[in-house]
């Protein structure tokens, strides 16, 4: 298949837009309105002054199988770093962490599930009965503060409905893949039931042997998946003018981790395969009162217990045996209290408080003996005040301004003797100008400031001068245009952006001893300056009631403006995990008699694996297919993941790991091979 180069994306999209605008006839069905809920004021996607993507339930069912990982390629300028069994670390517009081993957990991409903050631990994103996925690109400093320097991923589970619901879903596939799920719901009984009181529950078990064969142990399940999901959500009216929404989740992902091989194949030789287990629990309570003022309170707890272990030598050579294990407990408790004016909602004001507690226990073994051990405790308390004011300048023009100020106090201690208590005051906000012409469409120009707290590097080998790093500030200028035409079944949007990074935080690593694969010093440093700029476009067209075409495209440049770590000059080089181009194309066909088919193509250009070396991935295109038959009561579909059977690198490390000479070499984690399966769903009521 020919590869579409980034330089050709704008021409392709311009041709599509011109052909659609001049040659399509009216569509039979009006478009369903998509509402973005993650911002301070909910608004339709086509009237939201930010580059955003919303994936609805139909897209999640059609393009996905089990996890959010299946649909990430549909979002422009979104990437993720592997090295885990499921995506945990994300990058938006080239900004975001690739791991989190030690020190301060300061994620750049916010990750919320029904208001529960799983930023930095975003694995429990199973797809069954998920309502909507929203991705807001660019700094969201007014909304979420330091956790949204690069943007925000917001997941909403399906809302409860009073109508009775009982649905079973079963999946079987290659690699011993099997899943069974139940979705149930209906009207709430008792004093809080009322006309609109309702509940909804999801239970699912998913298992797979994975796509690796361990030659040393003669097993095919060392990189397998074993995931259990339990979600419950209820909505009711506790009093007059009050509404309440309670959401809780329990997700256990007891997965194997045996993904790397010395020859970069899918045949591993580790004698002590790793493990990637995350037990996620969360609870959120949203209260809202509508009157002259709208009062909204969101109280949430998100808890993640993680066991992450791997075979450090990736082999079974006698006398050369390294293993590493991390125990990580992460909890975020947050309270958001917000007031906004009723009606047009021309102002919003709020207070936010949170506490993040994290405990890490690292144990490295050499030949079965303790080689390195570190236990640390981290606590961060944040208090913030924020507000937004918007005003109509004329029937076509509107201006808005937002501001957030937060105070952040951190306490850290570990068994190496480190004890730190930094305190910071941080701020962010945005200025936005909106334009609505008479002939339709929506344009905006925004200037936003995002921020990310400073932190520290730990360990006895860290040089004193690099033990502490500063807070990062980011300024973003964005110009966008959105258009929706119900008559033609068309929505389109395009945004261009330029972001300036000051005291840019850069994650890097150094291998102290070439003969020790676990002797990495993981640290965060401040680059003097950096820039991230590019273009994002999305198009959805329904030329007939049976056919929907969708596509996205993204261009990105992310050069370091001035960065000279140690004896290297990275000025002008792109940042890690920031592909210069991405695109996706989806074709969804649904016949009137129940037959359906869907094709998804996703492409990403090459990117650097790390800021500590210059090794890169290769450009990669993947395809997914689904076809089947559906009725109002049941559906059956055959699906094919990675239909082209492409081998793509998700993560790469460059170091010495092969005795006796330990030459530096690139080791990569490959994508899963082609996999076929069958999913059947029955709606019993």
Question: Could you tell me what each predicted segment is?
Answer:
Residues 29-163, 479:
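Acidic, small-polar-rich N-terminal luminal/periplasmic segments of exported/outer-membrane proteins
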Residues 237, 242-251, 278-310, 321-424, ...:
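Face-selective signature of the C-terminal outer-membrane beta-barrel domain
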Residues 286-313, 436, 442-448, 470-542, ...:
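Membrane-embedded beta-barrel scaffold of Gram-negative outer-membrane proteins
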Residues 161-163, 171, 182-276, 304-319, ...:
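Periplasmic-side early beta-strands and strand-to-turn transitions of outer-membrane beta-barrels
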Residues 348, 392, 396-399, 407, ...:
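Gram-negative outer-membrane beta-barrel transporters
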Residues 105-108, 128-137, 142-214, 221-230, ...:
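Outer-membrane beta-barrel translocator/receptor signature
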Residues 4, 603-607, 629-685:
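C-terminal beta-signal and adjacent terminal beta-strands/loops
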Residues 185, 462, 560, 577-630, ...:
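C-terminal beta-barrel architecture of Gram-negative outer-membrane proteins
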């Amino acid at each position: 298949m020919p590869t579409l180069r980034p330089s050709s994306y704008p021409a392709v999209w311009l041709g599509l837009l011109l052909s659609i605008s001049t040659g399509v006839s009216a569509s039979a069905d009006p478009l369903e309105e998509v509402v973005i809920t993650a911002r301070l004021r909910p608004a339709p996607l086509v009237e939201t002054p930010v580059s955003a993507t919303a994936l609805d339930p139909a897209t999640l069912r059609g393009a996905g199988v089990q996890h959010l990982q299946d649909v990430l390629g549909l979002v422009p300028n979104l990437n993720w770093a592997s090295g885990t069994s499921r995506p945990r670390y994300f990058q938006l517009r080239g900004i975001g962490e690739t791991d989190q081993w030690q020190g301060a957990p300061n994620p750049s991409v916010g990750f919320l599930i029904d208001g529960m903050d799983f930023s930095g631990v975003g694995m429990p994103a199973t797809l069954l009965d998920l309502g909507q996925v929203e991705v807001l690109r660019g700094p969201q400093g007014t909304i979420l503060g330091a956790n949204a320097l690069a943007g925000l991923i917001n997941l909403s589970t399906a809302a409860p409905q009073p109508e009775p619901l009982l649905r079973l879903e079963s999946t079987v596939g290659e690699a011993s893949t099997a899943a069974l799920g139940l979705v149930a719901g209906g009207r709430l009984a008792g004093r809080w039931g009322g006309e609109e009181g309702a509940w909804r529950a999801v239970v699912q078990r998913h298992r797979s042997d994975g796509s690796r064969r361990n030659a040393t142990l003669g097993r095919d399940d060392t990189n397998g998946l074993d995931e259990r999901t339990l979600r419950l959500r209820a909505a009711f009216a506790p009093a007059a003018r009050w509404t309440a929404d309670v959401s809780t989740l329990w997700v256990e992902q007891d997965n194997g981790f045996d993904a790397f091989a010395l020859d970069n194949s899918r045949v591993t030789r580790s004698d002590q395969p790793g493990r990637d287990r995350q037990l996620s629990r969360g609870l959120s309570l949203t209260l809202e009162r509508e009157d002259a003022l709208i009062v909204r309170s969101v109280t949430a707890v998100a808890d993640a217990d993680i066991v992450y272990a791997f075979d450090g030598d990736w082999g079974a050579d006698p006398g050369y045996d390294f293993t590493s294990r991390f125990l990580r407990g992460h909890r975020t408790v947050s309270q958001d209290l917000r007031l906004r004016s009723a009606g047009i909602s021309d102002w919003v004001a709020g207070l936010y408080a949170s506490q993040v507690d994290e405990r890490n226990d690292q144990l490295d073994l050499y030949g079965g003996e303790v080689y390195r051990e570190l236990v640390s405790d981290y606590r961060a308390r944040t208090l913030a005040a924020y507000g937004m004011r918007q005003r109509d300048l004329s029937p076509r023009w509107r201006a808005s301004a937002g501001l957030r100020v937060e105070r952040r106090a951190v306490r850290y201690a570990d068994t190496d003797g480190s004890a730190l208590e930094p305190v910071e005051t941080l701020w962010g906000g945005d200025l936005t100008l909106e334009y609505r012409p008479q002939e339709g469409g929506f344009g905006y120009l925004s200037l936003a400031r995002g921020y990310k707290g400073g932190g520290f590097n730990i360990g006895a080998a860290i040089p004193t001068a690099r033990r502490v790093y500063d807070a990062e500030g980011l300024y973003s200028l964005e110009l966008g245009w959105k258009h929706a035409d119900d008559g033609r079944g068309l929505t389109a949007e395009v945004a261009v952006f330029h972001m300036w990074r000051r005291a840019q935080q850069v994650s890097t690593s150094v291998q102290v001893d070439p003969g020790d694969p676990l002797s990495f010093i993981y640290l965060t440093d401040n680059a003097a300056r950096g820039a991230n700029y590019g273009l994002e476009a999305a198009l959805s067209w329904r030329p007939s009631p049976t056919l929907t075409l969708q596509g996205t495209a993204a261009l990105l440049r992310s050069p370091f403006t001035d960065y000279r770590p140690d004896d290297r000059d990275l000025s002008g080089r792109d940042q890690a995990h920031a592909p210069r181009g991405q695109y996706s194309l989806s074709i969804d066909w649904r016949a009137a008699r129940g037959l359906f088919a869907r094709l998804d193509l996703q492409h990403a250009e090459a990117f650097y694996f790390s800021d500590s070396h210059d090794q890169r991935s290769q450009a990669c295109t993947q395809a997914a297919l689904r076809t089947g038959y559906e009725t109002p009561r049941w559906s059956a579909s055959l699906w094919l993941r990675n239909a082209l059977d492409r081998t793509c690198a998700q993560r790469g490390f460059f170091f010495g790991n092969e005795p006796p000479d330990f030459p530096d070499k690139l080791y990569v984690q490959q994508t899963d091979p082609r996999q076929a399966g069958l999913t059947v769903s029955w709606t019993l009521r």
